Amino acid sequence: MPGSVTTAPAPAVMAGLDPAIHDLNPGDPVDDRVYPRIESGDGHDEFFDGAGDPEPLSPAGGVRLTGIDLAQPLSPAVKAAIDAAFLAHHIVVFPNQSLTREQQFLFAANFGPVEAHGAHRGENKRYGVAHVMSNLGPDGTPTFRFSKAANYHWHTDKPYHPAPPMLTMLYAIELPPAGGDTEFGNMALAYSALPEGMKRRIAGLRAVFRPAFDGTRPAVDHPLVRTHPDTGVKSLYIGNHSTHILGLPEAEGAALLAELLQRATQPRFVYAHRWRVGDLVMWDNRSLLHRAVANYEVEKYRRVMHRSVVRGTVPF
């Protein structure tokens, strides 16, 4: 098979939610404010047997968790640890997993109702399994033709829905020998770094979102600055599906969105995940943008992922 890679090393992890993380200035060193620990009631750092120390992934967010077999039911302690890491770091990486599509679906269902697949064809007709995403054509060979161009632009998943997803997870099945990364932009950090004048300018504005390739779906508007329902933290809610801003001339709104996107995707706000086979990565759609990176020969190497999306709530 072309494009094999080694499995991920086994770092370790557990992190908890600390409001101090949201007072950081971009560029601050990574320290305990960014990656606080969870402590169990008896004062021990390890939240459950088999977990080690946290491995922070970048100042922009992300943490790696080991010692968890996602193919097995989650204990209350493990679920609580994952929830805390997810809220604190926005991105959680579980390396060295071995999951069927059914097992991935069941893991995703721990976090809420799992959405049905948008494409009801071939391998994705069944509900109750993870959705197959790949660069493969009908004959099983790599091709750029079936890659969605929108995936290579900064976006959050399904913002053109009245209640966009709360989280997305991808599980790496086949990868090119190098490249095929996914980048994540931390919109909470990006918002916190805006000048106060810009924050006042965009307060109360609503952005209009449309799907990139479906002209029949009605547009939906959401707050340009949304509040996280679990943490209360504000973040920008933008991306390539946002077309204009309600109440502003279309050109002015588009220019403002472009300026915000440029500010929000500076390298200091971005974590780039370099995939390894067996990685399962889950991220918070309420506080992040993401994009695929075509930094490999798309028409030569296979890239196959399994995807699950968990339903969210109406942004406010």
What residue ranges belong to the model's regions?
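Non-heme Fe(II) oxygenase catalytic core, chiefly the N-lobe of the double-stranded beta-helix
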Residues: 22-280, 285-316
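Intrinsic disorder/low-complexity segments
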Residues: 1-22
